[in-house]
């Protein structure tokens, strides 16, 4: 059975035409993208690397990594977001290869092909996150690195990521996230280690509603990223 939640895909299909509108529902993704790309680039030096972006959506992260000199492939199961990504790269002149395929299917086709794999804000939208993590392990070269980001599962995350972001501040459409699908760092770390990935670093992303700014911090209570390594 395919590791795809069609209801989740439908959510993003409906919003795809606004993906590159920085004042739309995707504003948070645009705002945090420079922080995330810098954090990744500092750890792997993207220039000259072959990179896979799993769950690329409309291509915000994929384009940014390509602009840093990486050769980027972006994959997603949403047809409309991928169409938006392909159109936008015609405007921006950034070269990214986009494909509609699951991580598991691409892992069968392209094992150990990528220096870096990113899988950001995607794991909380699939039925079996551990399956995606195993696929990422298979696709990264020995000695390569895999980056994941998701949302912690605790009362604070429910309050800020769902009640705050979706209902009070209206930064995201209601129903964007399902609290039951949020992932604790301990769970993500355990799944990564079982897959064969060593957790190297973790960082939190926090939002100040007064200044409307995000920053990287040691607070991993809500949004967080991890860096993992496939040993040689």
From Swiss-Prot:
User: Which EC number(s) does the record attach to this protein?
Assistant: 2.1.1.222, 2.1.1.64
Question: Gene3D superfamilies given for it?
Answer: Vaccinia Virus protein VP39
- GO biological process entries: methylation
Q: Which InterPro entries match?
A: SAM-dependent_MTases_sf, UbiG_MeTrfase
Q: In which pathway does it act?
A: Cofactor biosynthesis; ubiquinone biosynthesis
Protein name as catalogued: Ubiquinone biosynthesis O-methyltransferase
Report the protein's function.
O-methyltransferase that catalyzes the 2 O-methylation steps in the ubiquinone biosynthetic pathway.
What is stated as this protein's family in its record? Belongs to the methyltransferase superfamily. UbiG/COQ3 family.
Task: Please name the gene that encodes this protein.
Answer: ubiG
Protein source organism: Pseudomonas entomophila (strain L48)
Q: So where does S-adenosyl-L-methionine get bound?
A: 36, 55, 76, 120
Question: Does the record bear Transferase in its keywords?
Answer: yes
Per the UniProt entry, the signal peptide is: none
UniProt catalytic activity: a 3-demethylubiquinol + S-adenosyl-L-methionine = a ubiquinol + S-adenosyl-L-homocysteine + H(+); a 3-(all-trans-polyprenyl)benzene-1,2-diol + S-adenosyl-L-methionine = a 2-methoxy-6-(all-trans-polyprenyl)phenol + S-adenosyl-L-homocysteine + H(+)
**Which Pfam families does the annotation name?**
Methyltransf_23 (PF13489)
A molecular function (GO) held by this record is: 2-polyprenyl-6-hydroxyphenol methylase activity
* Keywords assigned by UniProt, alphabetized: Methyltransferase, S-adenosyl-L-methionine, Transferase, Ubiquinone biosynthesis
């Amino acid at each position: 059975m395919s590791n795809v939640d069609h209801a989740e895909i439908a959510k993003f299909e409906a919003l795809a035409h606004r993906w590159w509108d920085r004042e739309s529902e995707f504003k948070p993704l645009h705002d945090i993208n420079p922080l995330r790309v810098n954090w990744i680039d500092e750890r792997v030096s993207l220039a000259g690397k072959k990179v896979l972006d799993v769950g690329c959506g409309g291509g915000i992260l994929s384009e940014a990594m390509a602009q840093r000199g990486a050769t980027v492939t972006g994959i997603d199961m949403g047809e409309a977001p991928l169409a938006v990504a392909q159109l936008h790269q015609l405007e921006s002149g950034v070269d990214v290869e986009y494909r509609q395929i699951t991580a598991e299917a691409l892992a069968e086709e392209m094992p150990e092909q990528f220096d870096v794999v990113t899988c950001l804000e995607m794991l909380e939208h699939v039925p079996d996150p551990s399956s995606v993590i195993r696929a990422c392990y298979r696709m990264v070269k020995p000695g390569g690195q895999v980056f994941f980001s998701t949302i912690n599962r605790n009362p604070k995350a429910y309050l800020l990521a769902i009640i705050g972001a979706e209902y009070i501040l209206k930064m995201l459409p209601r129903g964007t996230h399902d609290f039951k699908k949020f992932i604790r760092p301990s769970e993500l770390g355990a799944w990564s280690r079982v897959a064969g990935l060593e957790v190297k670093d973790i960082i939190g992303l926090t939002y100040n509603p007064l200044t409307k700014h995000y920053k990287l911090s040691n607070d991993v209570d809500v949004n967080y990223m991890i860096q993992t390594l496939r040993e040689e």
